[in-house]
Amino acid sequence: MLDRHLHPRIKPLLHQCVRVLDKPGITPDGLTLVGFAIGVLALPFLALGWYLAALVVILLNRLLDGLDGALARRRELTDAGGFLDISLDFLFYALVPFGFILAAPEQNALAGGWLLFAFIGTGSSFLAFAALAAKHQIDNPGYAHKSFYYLGGLTEGTETILLFVLGCLFPAWFAWFAWIFGALCWMTTFTRVWSGYLTLKSLQRQ
C-alpha cells in the first residue's frame, strides 16, 4: 500500500548513494549477497533477545536491498539479478518471524506461525501473477522500477519492515503485531488472487 508512494521519494536518494558505489569491483549481485548475509544475522540476534542489534541488521539489509536495485538500474537490470534479489528477499522475510519465535516460543510460536502462513499467501499470489504478467507482457506502471511485475496490496514491503521494526522495539507485543498483520496479509492475498484472476480472465476474452 505504501510502496508506490514511498519508492519515488526514496529513489533519488538511492541514486545519489550509488554514484559512490558505482565502482568496477562492486556489482548489484554482490550488494544483494552482502545485504542478505547481514540480514541473516537477525535470526541469531532475535533468538538471543538482542532486539536492537537485530533492528540494526534488518535496517542495513533493507538499505542494501535498495542500493542493489539502484545500482542495477544505473547499469542494466538483469533477469538473473532480479531472481537473486527476490529469492533472498523472501528468505529474509521468513527468517525474521522465525527469530521472534525462537526468542520466546511459548509466547510467539502460534502467532509467528500464523504470520509465516500468511506470508505464504502473499508471496505465492505475488509470484504467480508476476510470472503470468510477464508471459502476457502486462504493463506495470505503478512499479516501473521493478525487474518483474509487482502486484501491490494492503501489506507490501514497507508495511512488513514497519512490522519488524515495531517487533524489535516492542518485543513483548510481537504476538499481537503478528496476529493483526497476518490478518491484513490474508486480505492482501484475497484481493491479489481475485484481481489477478479477473485480469488474466479478461485477457482470454480478447
Swiss-Prot record:
It is found in: Cell inner membrane. Residues 61-79, 135-146, 197-206 are cytoplasmic. It is a multi-pass membrane protein. GO terms for cellular component: plasma membrane. It holds the Pfam family CDP-OH_P_transf. Residues 1-37, 103-111, 170-173 are periplasmic. One of its GO terms (molecular function) is phosphotransferase activity, for other substituted phosphate groups. PROSITE patterns: CDP_ALCOHOL_P_TRANSF. Its main location: membrane. The keyword Transmembrane helix applies. The keyword Transmembrane helix applies. This is Inner membrane protein YnjF.
